[in-house]
Swiss-Prot record:
A motif (RxLR) lies at residues 58-61. The keyword Transmembrane helix does not apply. This is Secreted RxLR effector protein 57. Belongs to the RxLR effector family. GO terms for cellular component: extracellular region; host cell cytoplasm; host cell nucleus. Keywords: Host cytoplasm, Host nucleus, Secreted, Signal, Virulence. It is found in: Secreted; Host nucleus; Host cytoplasm. Has the canonical translocation RxLR motif, but lacks the canonical EER motif, which characterizes most oomycete effectors identified so far. The gene is RXLR57. Residues 1-31 form the signal peptide. It comes from the Eukaryota. It comes from Plasmopara viticola (Downy mildew of grapevine). Secreted effector that completely suppresses the host cell death induced by cell death-inducing proteins. Its main location: secreted.
Length: 128
């Protein structure tokens, strides 16, 4: 993929980005776009405001399919913003435990990533 085209894709809106990622056939390019998406501060703030919706599920599913979680391309903190809504009035106790585990500095990054992978798979399983 040419740099110019990649730049256009990366400068698209969040929903356009998700659509572009879904349409891309090259898994390396898709992983790269997902990794860039979750690292951008602006888009991470957008992700933090998402509710448990089709959009959130699509982001998680894409990340899981592309191995972005296992490879560490998506940080634990970025994934936490997707999995755990800020405005949740009654957070699931399992998700609350994930938050406390994330803030525990004695836990390794590998452990935290595995915890979030499990959490993401759980959400994808229980949500329609």
């Amino acid at each position: 993929m040419h740099r110019k085209r990649l730049r256009v894709v990366l400068s698209a809106t969040l929903l356009d980005l998700i659509t572009c990622v879904q349409l891309m056939l090259d898994p390396l390019v898709r992983s790269h776009v997902i990794a860039r998406l979750v690292r951008w501060r602006h888009h991470r703030l957008l992700l933090a405001e998402l509710v448990l919706s089709e959009t959130r599920v699509r982001i998680l599913r894409l990340a899981l399919e592309q191995g972005a979680l296992e490879s560490g391309a998506m940080s634990s903190r970025a994934l936490a913003r997707i999995v755990i809504p800020r405005s949740s009035s009654r957070p699931n106790w399992k998700l609350s435990r994930v938050v406390s585990e994330l803030s525990d500095n004695s836990k390794t990054n590998v452990y935290k990533n595995q915890l979030f992978i499990h959490c993401a798979r759980y959400l994808l399983h229980v949500l329609p």
